[in-house]
A protein has these predicted regions:
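Catalytic cores and adjacent flexible loops of soluble metabolic enzymes
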Residues: 1-350
Length: 350
């Protein structure tokens, strides 16, 4: 598998800036104008991409399949009720959304939930495919999407390590080596104790060289920011223009534009702070190096020719003289010059 590749011209993977996806899902509420607002505000918030979901209710769920989430606006409904309410955007609608994203300078793609959706998105020339956690073991769908030859983003919620390996192998079988694995806990919203960020490190060890990130279902920006500090190369966060909207059940648990902006800013701050694993004096520390450290200092006046004794010495700031770790080497030397009391001692003096 490749450790670095490109999505719509942007490098993604190991050693690259974290790729931030605003996961709009179906928060467009089947309203094209709202979909365009999602795109515009995501771009203004600093996200690298926006992602939607492409499905038809009848192709992914039976009419009686119970929900695994709570939906206040329809508490007794089934999965089919939700999906059927939110699957009304046509291929032409998606074409319009992708065109609008290109117009405002934001990468856009979608999660296909069936082979027909893959084909439609491929025809629309999306730059990547995302496979949802629940479909990682739907191997025919994974292979069908991977065969298109675009980068694959695989969420791993509910999956065993063996199932993740099988999904990677499915991509390899059809010649797709451009894959990102996203750690995920399939719970909406997910409390911090359920996130298990260290699983990202486990995925990195299990599949060396494969880029790893986080599909985040927590509230706020703390968890995804911490994920970047642990090495996440991609963050996906649910996104809405307004948490109070009805329609999609995801609005209330999604980041709004202010939160997305805060998340992107926090991630970029962490990236700058991570720096490099080389210990030494940083350029920003140069003044502190000179003036916050201490030097061997005369505790009394030391006339020229005097053999220096320990009681004649102390150590004080600044650090422009002999480092205190060499104090014992100064003891027993002869003063070459008159050294006034409270003087920073240099090697030229002794």
């Amino acid at each position: 598998m490749k450790s670095t590749f490109f999505i719509d011209g942007r490098p993604v993977g190991l050693g690259q800036p974290c790729y931030v996806i605003a996961e709009a899902g179906v928060n467009h509420n089947c309203d094209l104008a709202l979909g365009k607002r999602l795109i515009e505000t995501a771009q203004a918030s600093g996200a690298d991409a926006i992602k939607f979901q492409s499905y038809e209710a009848g192709k992914i769920v039976t009419r009686v399949a119970p929900r695994y989430w709570v939906e206040a606006q329809d508490p007794r409904g089934t999965q089919w009720d939700t999906f059927d309410r939110l699957d009304k955007l046509s291929a032409e609608d998606f074409r319009a959304l992708l065109a609008h994203a290109r117009k405002v300078g934001l990468t856009a793609f979608s999660t296909p939930f069936d082979d027909d959706a893959v084909d439609i998105l491929a025809a629309l020339d999306v730059p990547a495919f995302k496979i949802a956690s629940a479909d990682l073991t739907t191997t025919p769908l994974v292979e069908h999407a991977a065969r298109v030859g675009r980068p694959m983003i695989l969420s791993t919620g509910t999956c065993t390590l063996g199932e993740v390996e099988e999904a990677l192998e499915a991509c390899r079988r059809v010649g797709n080596e451009e894959v990102v694995l996203l750690h995920c806990t399939l719970k909406y919203p997910c409390p911090p104790e359920g996130i298990n960020l260290r699983m990202m490190e486990h995925l990195m060890r299990a599949f060396p060289g494969v880029p790893v990130g986080l599909s985040d279902h927590s509230l706020g920006v703390a968890v995804p920011t911490a994920a970047v500090a642990l090495g996440a190369c991609m963050i996906e966060k649910h996104y809405t223009v307004d948490k109070t909207l009805l329609g999609s059940p995801d609005h209330h648990l999604s980041a709004d534009p202010a939160e997305m902006r805060a998340l992107v800013d926090s991630i970029r701050t962490v990236e700058r702070a991570l720096g490099k694993a080389e210990k030494g004096v940083e350029p920003l520390e140069r003044k502190a190096f000179l003036y916050a450290r201490r030097s061997v200092t005369s505790a009394v006046a030391i006339p020229r020719g005097t053999t220096i004794e320990r009681k004649m010495l102390t150590y004080k700031r600044p650090g422009t003289g002999i480092n205190p770790r060499f104090l014992d080497l100064v003891v027993g030397r002869v003063a070459r010059v008159d050294i006034p009391v409270d003087t920073t001692i240099t090697w030229e003096m002794v």
